[in-house]
Amino acid sequence: MMRPMTASAIPDGVLVLAGTPIGRVADAPPRLAEELAGAGVIAAEDTRRLRCLLTDLGVETSARVVSYFEGNESARTPVLLEALLAGERVVLVTDAGMPSVSDPGYRLVAAAVEAGVVVTAVPGPSAVLTALAVSGLPVDRFCFEGFLPRKAGERARRLAGLAGEERTLVFFEAPHRTEAALAEMATAFGGDRRAAVCRELTKTYEEVVRGPLADLVAWAADGVRGEVTLVVAGATPAAVDTDPDALRAAVRSEEHTSELQSPMYLVCRLLLEKK
């Protein structure tokens, strides 16, 4: 039987994607402290938050700490790859959850794989899986969409393209945009589509609000705070009227209102194009 690989057994010149807590530091995987302590380089989305994490975990490290976030990811990737090729162990951490999942990391992983560098992970907490588990919605098949586009037209097109998706959908959203996102989902998917707003998962003020999208829009009108993950039930075959005459009538109705970028207009146009 093979022994489990510990940090000391992992060869140098390896990229370690380390999952960090999404709320409570007690949820940190035991291996996280070991990997941080033994790293040659730690690439962190926010070096200040990394320092706090090291303190909370009681970890002392002699690693070289570098920032690695969306704004410098392209420039820093070659630097970190050079360190990996020189035989250093690079540990990548983001503010919360797993690197690469709606967080920095993909470019470095792709570059490391291309260069033949070993890539491994310290599995950790995931807001996506946690939200799915507590949502009360089907989790046998799901689709993670990350953050919706900020521009209204792009956001409407994204939701229109997902209107007929039968898998459960998971989104990240900023608290100040949650009400608008729910309203646009209600328009694109139907106000009776079931969903769950998962807020501050694993933290002191954790809250999961479940119900039809229309009800959740009304709930969010009072304001939403904290980290938000949205889980939306997938479409049922009967939920989307694909009768060509009905779709053309809906398109004409939207054209008369000049709302040519509305989710409803785009949904109907997309469905007609598939006919």
Per-segment meaning from a language model:
Residues 36-42, 116-120, 168-169:
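Short active-site oxyanion
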Residues 45, 68, 93-95, 120-122, ...:
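Structural motif
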